Amino acid sequence: MTSEVSTNTPPPSPISGARIARNAGAMMAAQLLTWAMAFVVAIFQPRILGPLAIGQLSIAFSIWMIVGVLITFGMDTYLTKAVAREPQRTGVLVGTSLVVRIGLWLLGCLAVFGYDLFAVNADPTQTALIWIIGLMTLFSVLSGGLIATLNGLEQVHYVSLVTVLSKMVLTVVSLALLFAGFNVIWIGWANVLAALVAFLGDAFFLFRQHRPRWSIDLAAAGLMLNVSKQYLVTALTLMVYQQIDRLFIALFASTEAVGWYGTAVNLFGTLMFFPMAIGTVIFPTLTRRFAAGQEHLAMAAQPIFNIMLALSIPIGLGLVAIAEPVALLLYGEAFRPTGVVLAVLGIVLICTYLNTVLSQLLIAADRTAALNIIMIAATVATLPLDAILIPWTNRVFANGALGGALAYTITELGILIAAIKVLPKGTLGAQNWRVGVLTGLAGAGMLLAIWWLRESTFFFLAVPLGAAVYIGLVLAFRALPDDDLTIIKEALSKLIARLPFIGRKLKPAQPEA
């Protein structure tokens, strides 16, 4: 058994501001680029392939994303922590993790074979896609272990570089295949290629510094799985919550309905760039106040909650207004049912933006256990909601995807209410409810101002008109405190400064000595 004496462990290196800035900038650039590429694919892929093929691809991804969490078994979090504490054991830890993942992937294949045999209709294309995406999952879970290790070594810039490269490969190859007339099977192979590129790229940067030891240490593997299982529950709960709707729609409605739902959710997902980007810029600065004591929680929580309220309401209600014409424009008549699903997801978006902030606050306030209970409850609630709403909307509206969206709305609203209730007392105050009411009124005014455009050929004018009306009403109502407006201005300045090329051009020139 391999072990290290604690006295040989080198002292941790001092915190480097330059390293933190480099990692944050790399993550920001990678997020922006991958978001842009995902957006391009989300537009062209459904229109060219059609709802049936998109549904088949979505089902395959949903199955393996759930199984992938079981294969990972929470080891990513364990690896990051273990490597950060004992970098000299990187080779042993990585080698053990990779071998364990391969073994768990083989077990996962047996489980998927059973599901494919009994739960999925005898469709050769669907079966082929399931196993192609299964191969992609193998490379993805192996790459995930390497990424976790690089994160532990504080080499996030390598992770960002490889992420952008693999997404670029996926985007270019997928679009080339789509425009050349290849079917969904080839799109599945494009995902395999991108996952392989990611694995090889991560391996290149990691293995040149730390060679893995492929001889598995059973004691180390047992310890790794035992410690990692505490992270598995949260990850599995979240993944089941995110993916189970598609499998229920396939079971109670049709594969085409899965395509309608998956297309709407993918487009909705591209809008999640904003809370992640804002969290990257603002939240770390605000959470530093937690170190001063629990009483400073409200000082950090209230401004960012107000800001996310002010941002989520116009985007969410704007999506409600123009979802149907946007879906028709982007995807064509075959995806008309996607429009109403996307409109419902506009309401979900408001809740999800706020839930993103609340989950960060709960973790910062040492309420992780409460957050886990909320997510488990939401996942459990999703099952009967899907079982009731999907067949009902399929029967009444001929759109089972709508039932999945309604279930999603109910659970996200439930998470929002529960998360607010379990925050430490006084975290949110009367000022937050005032901001919520006034920004809600501004959003309602915006919705009334642009609703008539949804049936117009010029529906796209709803975006600038809605923005002007909303901003004008927010300022007129004095909905946001002056301090929050200052934070928004500073955040936008930091965001622009971190963007490649743009920030460099806007940086003022240094005066010559």
Provide a role label for each language-model segment:
Residues M1-M37, Q88-G91, G95, Q126, ...:
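N-terminal membrane topogenesis motif
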Residues T2-I20, I185, L200-Q242, V281, ...:
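Interhelical loop/hinge segments that connect adjacent transmembrane helices in multipass membrane
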Residues T2-N8, V100-T237, Q243:
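Hydrophobic transmembrane helix module of multi-pass membrane transport proteins
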Residues S3, A378, N432-D482, R504-A513:
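Transmembrane alpha-helical segments of multi-pass transport proteins
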Residues S3-E4, S16-D76, C109, F113-D116, ...:
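Signature of the first transmembrane helix
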Residues Q31, M37-V41, S58-A84, T137-G144, ...:
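Small-residue-rich midsections of specific transmembrane alpha-helices
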Residues P46-G55, E154-H157, M168-L200, A369, ...:
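Membrane-interface helix-loop junctions in multi-pass transport and translocation proteins
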Residues A82-V100, W260-I376:
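Specific pore-lining/lateral-gate transmembrane helices of multi-pass inner-membrane transport
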